[in-house]
Amino acid sequence: MMVLAAAAMAGSVSLAMAQAAPATQTATPPAQTPQTTTTPATSDLPDAPSTSANVKAPAVPTGPTAVIDTSMGRITCQLYDKLAPIAAANFEGLADGSKDWIDATTQKKIHGQPFYNGTTFHRVIPGFMIQGGDRLGTGMGDAGYYFNNETDPSLTFDVPGRLAMANAGLGPNGTGTNGSQFFITEAPQPSLDGGYTIFGQCDEHSVLIVASIARVDRDSNDKPNTPVTINRIYILRNGDKPPAEPAASPATDHLVVHPGTTAPPQ
């Protein structure tokens, strides 16, 4: 099953809390005779480090914009085509039909047909993420191929709205298991850093939609009881204007005005 191997996954992987080791007591060093020192000249002193030296500059997405029209509203994300070129190009190709894929049911090669249209978010967890990209809707489907992770130290799960590839860890030959499934985070998830390829960033309004989808009624496997459908994904390039947003299904009972940032249930 294509899952997120993270602490937030209800009913699967529990959080392994790191416990600090007790401090080791050491003997007090013997007293030493103080030595006379001279104050160095100002010109010999090193430059004071900048107060911003350790501040990480945020990664800026520079690629196309993915407009994901769902049955509960529109999600808009810009892709990191420079930091995750393989994942970004893969998502673009599956979304607009320019990339071939294998039908998981018939095992036939599909050409020129968008992969994601009509699929659902098959796994949703409040405070954590929503997961989609499986035409089977079971968490077991893919596009008939896999590729390795693309991780960059400047791109972490430190903010809400990260668009990332779902995977099942390493394959039997030590290769990656990224394919078609993806997820979008509702809140920062540092426990996922380094294990999943981030290839896009969704805007603030989209995070509200993600939070609303994450709170629909769902079963014990976190699958929505009423399907939340991806109607279509548009890839906008070179200043393309987004199409008019279609009317979404009523979801006022689940609308989240301020998404929570609590840790996912264990």
What residue ranges belong to the model's regions?
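NTP-dependent nucleotidyl-transfer catalytic core
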Residues: 1-7
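Cyclophilin-like peptidyl-prolyl cis-trans isomerases
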Residues: 2, 15-266
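Hydrophobic h-region of N-terminal signal peptides that target proteins for export
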Residues: 7-17
